[in-house]
């Protein structure tokens, strides 16, 4: 019951924090130039968050269980076995250790690639409905907005699964670490999403709806995961390090959205095929500085979180 109360409070805090962070660009009236600058900053936040926060946290969650398990196993072995068996046991232990590490390396790559490929397929399915329209440029732009929101919602849902799986372990420290990691990138992601949608010309009411769906995805999925897991499922999940796998899958979706949609849209790359179009001029020095700053902010926050 205590776990249920804690997961409920964490979910509520996640919803409110994410929505408030996303409302900031809507609450302030920006000029055209300022809006572009904020959008570029938001794009930097998305990229920096994917690379500096989500991937390391996912890898950490994946390895933490194994390292803790090895620590307990080693101490038990030390207490139980006789000294003449110690050398033999340590050889077996070393072999198991390297085997586990090989498995974990595979988990990291597979989870990231699956997340990226999943979003790629979603994007292509969306694009297949676009080619039949009269104005492919406008249709592609509209599709880009939907895919960006969908990608971030899928990512947030995977975050929710990670938090729900963490809550099911009944370890408060694990729950808090996963919660802080999620909040560190959900707030910048909400800001980045809203500024991108504003730049893309979506009406404010629709932006609020997109933001609400994004803000709800993680809390709802964390509750569903927590309530839907039976005791045997929880044990199976802890065996395969579900928290780490879910976070790395969501990192793959996040990377796709940040690099394939948001950055090209902001830089005007690939959306205009005419040589004289203004969209292909690239970024000004100030915009590049904002992009770099956006990439560095999550890195600084994550370094502060680790210490």
Curated annotation (Swiss-Prot):
Protein known as: Zinc transporter ZIP9
Chief subcellular location: Golgi
Job description of the protein: Transports zinc ions across cell and organelle membranes into the cytoplasm and regulates intracellular zinc homeostasis. Participates in the zinc ions efflux out of the secretory compartments. Regulates intracellular zinc level, resulting in the enhancement of AKT1 and MAPK3/MAPK1 (Erk1/2) phosphorylation in response to the BCR activation. Also functions as a membrane androgen receptor that mediates, through a G protein, the non-classical androgen signaling pathway, characterized by the activation of MAPK3/MAPK1 (Erk1/2) and transcription factors CREB1 or ATF1.
Triggers of expression: Up-regulated by testosterone in cancer cells.
Organism phylogeny: Eukaryota, Metazoa, Chordata, Craniata, Vertebrata
Keyword field: Cell membrane, Cytoplasm, Glycoprotein, Golgi apparatus, Ion transport, Membrane, Mitochondrion, Nucleus, Transmembrane, Transmembrane helix, Transport, Zinc, Zinc transport
Any one Gene Ontology molecular-function term assigned to this protein's record: androgen binding
InterPro entries in the cross-refs: ZIP, ZIP9
Reaction catalysed by this enzyme: Zn(2+)(in) = Zn(2+)(out)
Bilayer-crossing regions: 4-24, 35-55, 106-126, 146-166, 176-196, 210-230, 244-264, 286-306
Subcellular location: Golgi apparatus, trans-Golgi network membrane; Cell membrane; Cytoplasm, Perinuclear region; Mitochondrion
Family to which the UniProt record says this protein belongs: Belongs to the ZIP transporter (TC 2.A.5) family.
Encoding gene per record: SLC39A9
Expression sites (tissue/organ): Highly expressed in pancreas, testis, and pituitary and moderately in the kidney, liver, uterus, heart, prostate, and brain, whereas expression is lower in the ovary and colon.
Sites carrying sugar chains: 29, 241
Gene Ontology terms: biological process: bicellular tight junction assembly; intracellular zinc ion homeostasis; regulation of cellular response to testosterone stimulus; regulation of vascular endothelial cell proliferation; zinc ion transmembrane transport
Membrane topology according to the record: Multi-pass membrane protein
Signal peptide positions on this chain: none
Superkingdom classification of source: Eukaryota
UniProt KW Amino-acid biosynthesis keyword: no
Cellular component GO terms, alphabetical: mitochondrial membrane; mitochondrion; nucleus; perinuclear region of cytoplasm; plasma membrane; trans-Golgi network
């Amino acid at each position: 019951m205590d776990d249920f109360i804690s997961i409920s409070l964490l979910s509520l805090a996640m919803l409110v924090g994410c929505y408030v962070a996303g409302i900031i660009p809507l609450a302030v009236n920006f000029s055209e130039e300022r809006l572009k600058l904020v959008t570029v900053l938001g794009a930097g936040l998305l990229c920096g968050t994917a690379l500096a926060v989500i991937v390391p946290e996912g890898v950490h969650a994946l390895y933490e269980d194994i390292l803790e398990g090895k620590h307990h196993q080693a101490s038990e072995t030390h207490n139980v076995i006789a000294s003449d068996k110690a050398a033999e046991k340590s050889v077996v232990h070393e072999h198991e250790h390297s085997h586990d590490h090989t498995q974990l390396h595979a988990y990291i790559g597979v989870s990231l690639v699956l997340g990226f490929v999943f979003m790629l397929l979603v994007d292509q399915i969306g694009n297949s409905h676009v080619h039949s329209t009269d104005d492919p440029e406008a249709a592609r732009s509209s599709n880009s907005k939907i895919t960006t929101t969908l990608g971030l919602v899928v990512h947030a849902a995977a975050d929710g699964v990670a938090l729900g799986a963490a809550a099911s372990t009944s370890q408060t420290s694990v729950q808090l670490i996963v919660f802080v990691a999620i909040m560190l990138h959900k707030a910048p992601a909400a800001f980045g999403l809203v500024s991108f949608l504003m730049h893309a010309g979506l009406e404010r009411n629709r932006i609020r709806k997109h933001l609400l769906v994004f803000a709800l995805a993680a809390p709802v999925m964390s509750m569903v995961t927590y309530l839907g897991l039976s005791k045997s499922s929880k044990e199976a999940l802890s065996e395969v390090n579900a928290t780490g796998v879910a976070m790395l899958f969501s990192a793959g979706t996040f990377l796709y959205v940040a690099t394939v949609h948001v950055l090209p849209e902001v830089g005007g790359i690939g959306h205009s095929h005419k040589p004289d179009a203004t969209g292909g001029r690239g970024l000004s020095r100030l915009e590049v500085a904002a992009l770099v700053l956006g990439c560095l902010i999550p890195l600084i926050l994550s370094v502060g979180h680790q210490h």
